[in-house]
Structures are given as structure tokens and as C-alpha cells.
């Protein structure tokens, strides 16, 4: 492959979920320096849930988005700084503040059926000189053709790149292949495509490779897979695989390997890996950032995290419905108490 892959690191945004949004500015700077030295193309910086994500619903960050962005902007020399915005959480004013702090790429994220709510934010990003990227979360919940039509809307608003986003880590290689082909068939030739994979079924690397085979231009990944659920496609692993395939990625593999093991992995207060709980996310098709919230609810109410996650999947809950996790836990408690009571009555008969 002759074309240069665009390597988009998400350690300082999606990776924030893995440590409950507690990066210090010093840690953000150190990670950014390592990534910049390794020559990634962009570094995404924000609360895990995007600009203004710090809240009771999603969890408060150790710093504000602007503090993190300024910290990274003060040290990077090569990579562009990206940030993420979810309409309804962040506003155009937040985009302006991020731009003033040093961000130059606005990744506007919506649920995969709601691209129409991105119009104001994509148009504003272009107006102030930012690159605008459309980010269709939970892409497994739409058919390939319907998803491509949502991407077409984002393109019409001014997005120059549109992403297939496997937020639940629920897709396999055929799912990715079908969606990338639909994008290529529907979008203009000059509109780039991207893949954002999660590793809940251990397919983050495989899915990213398949996406590139189908013409994908940009690949999201993170050091040590740092991200929600079982994490994102591990950046250093993807680069090693890409190198073995002879692809032009333009990064320094060994610097990335060192950064993953020496800087990022020691920050994890819960291992970012495929285990019982994160596997349940992928199997049930649940938004990966629900993991820590579900674990907290399970501990509080004496439930199994897997039971909560599977029920969330059955109800088709999506990003932004974190407040419903407690409701699901209470419903499961009620069902447990009813079953216990019914069993007790049966014993008396």
C-alpha cells in the first residue's frame, strides 16, 4: 500500500474512561510528548465523554478540557490536536474555546441514527477554521446502508471525514467490511473515512485492518489500548501489524511500545483487557463506557456486573443514558426479591 495511513491517537480522550477521567496535566503532557515523538498524525484530547463531559452523569474530570488541551498544545510540535464534542453535552462555544486553546480538529459525535443534530457544530467548526469529522457512535445498531446515509448527512454539513464507530466493540470483520463498503459507495471520493474500534471481542486490530483493506483512511487507536471497556485497538499492536503488512504508517513502533508499557499501562487502576465484564459489553452490544458505571452499581446493590450489562443490551441503551444504569440495577433487585418471595411462598405450600 502506497498511501500514508492517518494515525489518530485517542489515549487522552477515550483512554480517559479507563481511569475515570483523572489524567493530571503532567501526565497528559508526558503522553503527548511520547506520541508526538513517535509521529502520530493527531492526538485527541478531552474528557472521555467529550467537551463538557465532566458531570454527575458521566463523572467529573481531574481538570477541565481546556486545561488538558492547553497542556498538550504546549508540548506538541508535529501532531494536530483533535477534540470530541457530543451535541447536547458540548456547545459551539466549547468548540471555540477548544480552538483558542490549540485544538484544530473537531470530531462531532452522535448516535448512529442522529446525524442531523450535528449540523450546527460541524458547520461552526468549519467556519472557525477547524477540520470537521463526523463520528457515528454505536455503528453496529444501524444497517450498513442506513449508516452510510447518516454519514452522507454529516458530509453535507461539511465533514471531510466520516467514521464507523464500534462503541460497543460488538462488530466482527464482515460487519466492518460491509459498513466501509457502504461508506465508499455513498460518500464523495474526496471524503475520507475512519475506523474507531473497541477490543471487547478481541477484534479491535482485526477490524481496523479490514477497514484499511476496504480503503479506510484514518485509524483510531490508543497506547496499551487505553479506553472504555476492553479498550480501543492498541496503537502499538496495530502499528506492528501494519508494518508486517507493508503499510505506510509513518510512526516509530518502538517509541510507541515504550510509551504504552512505561507511561500508560502503570496508570490503569483497572486492567484494560478482555475479561468477563468487558466481554459482556461486546457480546451484548453495550456502550463501552458503561463499564465503570455498571461495576459501581453492581457493588452498591449486590448484583453481578454482567447481569446489568446484558440487561442494558437487551434494552438497547445507548451513550448518554448512563443514568439508566441505576434504574436497571433497581429493576434487577426488584426481580430478585420477587423471585425470592415467590420461592418462599412455594416452600409453604
Swiss-Prot record:
The reaction(s) catalysed by this protein are:
(S)-4-hydroxy-2-oxopentanoate = acetaldehyde + pyruvate
Looking at the UniProt record, the site noted as Transition state stabilizer sits at 13
- Per UniProt, Mn(2+) binds at 14, 196, 198
**Catalytic residues per the record?**
17 (proton acceptor)
> Cross-referenced InterPro entries, in alphabetical order?
2-IPM_HCS-like, 4OH_2_O-val_aldolase, Aldolase_TIM, DmpG_comm, DRE_TIM_HOA, PYR_CT
Q: Which UniProt keywords apply?
A: Aromatic hydrocarbons catabolism, Lyase, Manganese, Metal-binding
Q: Which CDD domains match?
A: DRE_TIM_HOA
Q: Where does substrate bind?
A: 13-14, 167, 196, 287
Q: Which top class of enzyme applies to this chain? A: lyase
Indicate whether Metal-binding appears among the record's keywords: yes
GO: which molecular function terms? 2-isopropylmalate synthase activity; 4-hydroxy-2-oxovalerate aldolase activity; manganese ion binding
Supply the EC number(s).
4.1.3.39
Q: Name one GO biological process term.
A: L-leucine biosynthetic process
**Which residue ranges does the record assign to the Pyruvate carboxyltransferase domain?**
5-257
Keyword Zinc: yes or no?
Answer: no
What family, per the record? Belongs to the 4-hydroxy-2-oxovalerate aldolase family.
Query: What is the name of the protein in this document?
Result: 4-hydroxy-2-oxovalerate aldolase 1
From which organism does this entry originate? Paraburkholderia phymatum (strain DSM 17167 / CIP 108236 / LMG 21445 / STM815) (Burkholderia phymatum)
Which classification does the entry list for the species? Answer: Bacteria, Pseudomonadati, Pseudomonadota, Betaproteobacteria, Burkholderiales
Amino acid at each position: 500500500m502506497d498511501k500514508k495511513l492517518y494515525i489518530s491517537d485517542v489515549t487522552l480522550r477515550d483512554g480517559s474512561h479507563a481511569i475515570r477521567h483523572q489524567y493530571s496535566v503532567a501526565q497528559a503532557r508526558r503522553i503527548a510528548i511520547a506520541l508526538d515523538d513517535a509521529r502520530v498524525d493527531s492526538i485527541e484530547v478531552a474528557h472521555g465523554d467529550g467537551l463538557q463531559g465532566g458531570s454527575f452523569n458521566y463523572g467529573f474530570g481531574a481538570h477541565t478540557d481546556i486545561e488538558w488541551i492547553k497542556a498538550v498544545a504546549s508540548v506538541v510540535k508535529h501532531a494536530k490536536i483533535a477534540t470530541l464534542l457530543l451535541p447536547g453535552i458540548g456547545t459551539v462555544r466549547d468548540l471555540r474555546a477548544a480552538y483558542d486553546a490549540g485544538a484544530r480538529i473537531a470530531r462531532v459525535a452522535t448516535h448512529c441514527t442522529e446525524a442531523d443534530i450535528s449540523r450546527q457544530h460541524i458547520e461552526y467548526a468549519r467556519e472557525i477554521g477547524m477540520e470537521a469529522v463526523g463520528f457515528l457512535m454505536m455503528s453496529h445498531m444501524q444497517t450498513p446502508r442506513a449508516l452510510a446515509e447518516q454519514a452522507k448527512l454529516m458530509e453535507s454539513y461539511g465533514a471531510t471525514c466520516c467514521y464507523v464507530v464500534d462503541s460497543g466493540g460488538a462488530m466482527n470483520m464482515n460487519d466492518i467490511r460491509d459498513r466501509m463498503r457502504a461508506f465508499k459507495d455513498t460518500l464523495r471520493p474526496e471524503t475520507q473515512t475512519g475506523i474507531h474500534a473497541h477490543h471487547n471481542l478481541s477484534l479491535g486490530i482485526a477490524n481496523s485492518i479490514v477497514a484499511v483493506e476496504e480503503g479506510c483512511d484514518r485509524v483510531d487507536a490508543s497506547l496499551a489500548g487505553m479506553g472504555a471497556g476492553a479498550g480501543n485497538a492498541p496503537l502499538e499492536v496495530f502499528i506492528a501489524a501494519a508494518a508486517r503488512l507493508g503499510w505506510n504508517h509513518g510512526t516509530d513502533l518502538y517509541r510507541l511500545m515504550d510509551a504504552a508499557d512505561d507511561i500508560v499501562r502503570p496508570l490503569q487502576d483497572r486492567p484494560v483487557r478482555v475479561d468477563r465484564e468487558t466481554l459482556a459489553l461486546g457480546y451484548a452490544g453495550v456502550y463501552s463506557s458503561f463499564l465503570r458505571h455498571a461495576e459501581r452499581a453492581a457493588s452498591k446493590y449486590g448484583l453481578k456486573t454482567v447481569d446489568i450489562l446484558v440487561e442494558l443490551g437487551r434494552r438497547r441503551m445507548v451513550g448518554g443514558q448512563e443514568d439508566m444504569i441505576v434504574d436497571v440495577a433497581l429493576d434487577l433487585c426488584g426481580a430478585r426479591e420477587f423471585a425470592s418471595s415467590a420461592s418462599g411462598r412455594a416452600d409453604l405450600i
